[in-house]
Structure formats: C-alpha cells, structure tokens
C-alpha cells in the first residue's frame, strides 16, 4: 500500500507533468496562430493569457469556480449532461496549474519566435513547404531552447501552486492534496515533522529545476556569444 506522503508527492508530480505538457502544446499553437493575426482580437487574447500574472490566486480561484463549479458557466453543462464534476478533483489541480503557467510558457515561446529571421520562413515557402511543415521542421527546432526553458519554469510554477488550487481542487488528503497543501496543513496542525519532510522535498525539486534552467540559459548565452 502506497503511503499517504508518497501519494502526495506522486500527485504533485503528476499534476505538474501533465499541465506542463498541455501548456507547452497549447502555447506553441497559440503563438503560431496569433502571430498571423494583428487585429484587436490578438491583444484581447494575450490580455486574457497574461491575466493570471496580475490577479491574486484567491481571485483566480474564485473566477475558476464561477466557470467550472457545478453551477458555473461550463461546470453546470458538464455536470448536467455528462455527470462530470471538475471541482474538488485532481483534474481541477491540472486546470489551475495550466492557467497559472500559461503566461510563462506563452511568453517564452513568443520571444523565441519573435527572434527568428523571416528569411527562414521565406526559404521554406519557396521550397514548397506548407505552414505546418515550416512550424514543425523550421520553427520548432530553432526555438527548442525557449520551449525547454518555458517547460522548466512552468513545471516549477505548477509544483508550487497553492492558492487557486486550494479553492478549486480543495485540500483532500490522498485525492487532491499536493505538497504545498500538505505543508500548509501540517504547519496549521503543529506537525513540524511532516512539514519539514515536504519542505525538504520541494526544495530539492526546486534546486534541480533551477539548475536545469540555468544550464539552458547558459547554453543559449554561449551560443549567442559564439555568433
């Protein structure tokens, strides 16, 4: 039988990994699509994408409840017609992590694409490549470090997410409780042993994430200097 502490660690990793993969795919597609649209609609989309950077976690959590709760705009439909309840599930943790990491990943990919020389794309089009082929064979390989850096930042942010997740997913041990929530619960109940255990775990993971990010940044900087 898996111990509760191990379940908490595995759940936190699962939420962080899945949300990071999802936000990577969505961010690449969003940047690619919005890059071809210079209308006001693009500005509105980018404002919505970056909104979570400028509002508190509790406000974000409440907004998500209004949307995904059983009486929410989307949640009511899911519950009525498909008997799906997002709130107080581990999927709520993934959705919250996705929302809070989307600005990090989106802006990282956007910066990468903005730095590319348009000559590459023109050469691809002259060679008969479709826009999707240009994205897959030219754009993505050239911005892979931006994507990796964004993934590292997104994973780290998802690992430490607390406020909005607490409101949408709840703090249910063995079901939705993540490492950050476990530290909060343990400290509230005076269980310093458990709080210190999870503190060490999250710090170790954070240091590993920072080492990977610094390595990617150093490699990118070295490549720029070589040019």
Predicted features along the sequence, with ranges:
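Periplasmic/extracellular loop-to-transmembrane helix junction in inner-membrane transport proteins
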Residues: 1-21, 33-39, 188-192
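Transmembrane alpha-helices
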Residues: 21, 106-109, 117, 132-164
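Membrane-cytosol interface at the C-terminal ends of specific transmembrane alpha-helices
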Residues: 86-125, 150-151, 211, 215
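Interhelical loop and adjacent transmembrane-helix boundary motif
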Residues: 1-7, 168-211
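Membrane-helix interface segments
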Residues: 37-45, 73-74, 89, 119, ...
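Transmembrane-helix boundary motif in ABC transporter permease subunits
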Residues: 18-49, 64, 112-118, 139, ...
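Membrane-interfacial helix termini and adjacent extracytoplasmic/periplasmic loops
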Residues: 61-98, 168-172
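C-terminal transmembrane helix and the adjacent membrane-cytosol boundary/short C-terminal tail
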Residues: 41, 110-125, 138, 192-227
